[in-house]
Amino acid sequence: MSQLVRPTLELPAGRRKVLLHSCCAPCSGEVMEAMTASGIDYAIYFYNPNIHPVKEYEIRKNENIRFAEEHGIEFIDADYDMDNWFERVKGMENEPERGIRCTACFDMRFERTALYAHEHGFDTITSSLGISRWKDMNQINGCGERAAARYDDLVYWTYNWRKGGGSQRMIEISKRENFYQQEYCGCVYSLRDTNRHRRAQGRERIHLGVKFYGVEEKL
């Protein structure tokens, strides 16, 4: 593992219990280990109706369940609300990644996370989405804060999970655990656009369920 010293985390003032929205095991691995190392009380909330097809959704979810069980962390498996997701992003099918479709997607996922947190005694929500260098952290934080603002007792923790070596440790943990390595964000439109880009470069299309972190290095 990296020799970088993981910083001790402190929750926003007066906060005690976190509901972590997890998008996948690779992104949440470092977030989980960092919170565990800092003695933070948290649970994982998996609500990602944006992941398609179902085969890909199940692979990503099961990787996250496996890692949560290894660490003894509660894993809350929310509904696979795919039909409502498609309705939410209707008319945005051809918007670029990081655009308004992604904002609508984040809003939907964080709104459900915030509702669950409010109803089950969590005073803080955050997400593993921001650790990925492919994501716009300001976009994610804006969606998270907007969702949390619906409830007087809730805040969105805008901690930058990339800093202090977080991004590097994310990759190291993924290789250590041989996590499934997804090759697109999640939705059918992301899969479509990624495959279009690959074809333009003369590369093979994405094959689901075959690529894992660290496996090639061991061969």
From Swiss-Prot:
Enzyme nomenclature, EC number: 1.17.99.6
GO terms for biological process, alphabetical: queuosine biosynthetic process; tRNA modification
Molecular function GO labels: 4 iron, 4 sulfur cluster binding; epoxyqueuosine reductase activity; metal ion binding
Pfam families (UniProt xref): QueH
Disulfide bridge map: C185-C187
Catalyses which reaction(s): epoxyqueuosine(34) in tRNA + AH2 = queuosine(34) in tRNA + A + H2O
The keyword Metal-binding belongs to this UniProt entry's keyword annotation: yes
Chain residues that bind [4Fe-4S] cluster: C23, C24, C102, C105
Name of this chain's protein: Epoxyqueuosine reductase QueH
Organism of derivation: Bordetella pertussis (strain Tohama I / ATCC BAA-589 / NCTC 13251)
Source organism phylogeny: Bacteria, Pseudomonadati, Pseudomonadota, Betaproteobacteria, Burkholderiales
